[in-house]
Amino acid sequence: MRAELNNGLIDFLKASPTPFHATATLVQHFEAAGFQRLDERDTWAIETGGRYFVTRNDSSIVAFRMGRQSPLTGGIRMVGAHTDSPCLRVKPQPELQRQGFWQLGVEVYGGALLAPWFDRDLSLAGRVTFRRDGKVESQLIDFKLPIAVIPNLAIHLNRTANEGWAINAQNELPPILAQVAGDERADFRALLTDQLAREHGLNADVVLDYELSFYDTQSAAVVGLNGDFLAGARLDNLLSCYAGMQALLNSESDETALLVCTDHEEVGSSSTCGADGAMLEQIVQRLLPSSEDYVRTIQKSLLISADNAHGIHPNYAEKHDANHGPKLNAGPVIKVNSNQRYATNSETAGFFRHLCMAEEVPVQSFVVRSDMACGSTIGPITASHLGIRTVDIGLPTFAMHSIRELAGSHDLAHLVKVLSAFYASHELP
């Protein structure tokens, strides 16, 4: 099971270079399992035992399985994750021609660790909006090939490079795509038009706009002398999206189960398709006949917010509280913060720990050092919007927000096992 899950995750990561592609890949899995697509603009006819999914902005998805008994009776078991990861996004007018090279101006999306982006074989993917035959259409594209690179400055010209230096995102991050000769002018939109034709056979009249990100073409892999680790891009947080999907597809229960994977977590979640928007609340409201039933159901429900946790690094152990250093391959981590940066409380943490014990899954705890600021997740946001009890958990990870992160190769199976047990559980606290 472990090898099968890890290989499946590697394939999932390869197919999901952007939130748009991640959502499309999730859709493929759910449709293959018989889930029915719902359109928010239509009237819904939800059936007992039915399986459905809804997407918004092509970058967020809510998938759910209606239980054989009403959610008003047993509540809803929810797992939440996010589809986005820190990256470099192409600007609207990105063309740069400097010293005979064609480069693209980029914005830093989220809290990216920038140094690892240098000297990597980069490709480009995302969503393009264009006009064709008088109509506005959108399509996902993925160049797949390594078409760009951000070369480092040689140490001979930067003698203090190994002493640390501040990276200037405006000047130092534009990737190089090609050399240009003489008066030749680079045309990025023409490149996108060609890609639409090459990848999809679409003859666009004009490219109107786009949301495109660079990504590392190196595939994720199981690494280490004994295969102990899983290395790859976007483990934060596509690892949790994949685990939640596997758990939802492979668990059976009389209760209603739901997976929500939203966009824009890395930049605050404030969007129509982010956790700070109304998407999840609006969808859950449509599953229940009245506002009173909605409130009653939410109070019987529970959310597991799944997002990667900081594993204790052997070279930087002092960055962790000595008693709360999660180890790779030692199971999922319960995240706790008294200032509500995580939504965990003693009741929800206790229930998650109970699930882990029942499934013989190891479990750990994380609290940030008292002299360091704590990050956050969709957990507190969703708990606030819905009023739902929540526990924040995640798998230990090194190099979070790097272009290539590292997790334990045993932990994905641990997480899928406990999330499956959660979806199948007959009683909530």
From Swiss-Prot:
Annotated EC: 3.4.11.-
Organism in which the protein naturally occurs: Pseudomonas savastanoi pv. phaseolicola (strain 1448A / Race 6) (Pseudomonas syringae pv. phaseolicola (strain 1448A / Race 6))
InterPro entries: M18_aminopeptidase_2, Peptidase_M18, Peptidase_M18_dom2
Family per similarity comment: Belongs to the peptidase M18 family.
EC supergroup of this enzyme: hydrolase
Keywords on record: Aminopeptidase, Hydrolase, Metal-binding, Metalloprotease, Protease, Zinc
PANTHER family per the UniProt record, alphabetical: ASPARTYL AMINOPEPTIDASE
NCBIfam families named among the record's database cross-references: PRK02813.1
Cofactor: Zn(2+)
Binding site for Zn(2+): H82, H156, H401
Position of the signal peptide: none
The name this protein goes by in its record: Probable M18 family aminopeptidase 2
Alphabetical list of SUPFAM superfamilies matching this protein: Aminopeptidase/glucanase lid domain, Zn-dependent exopeptidases
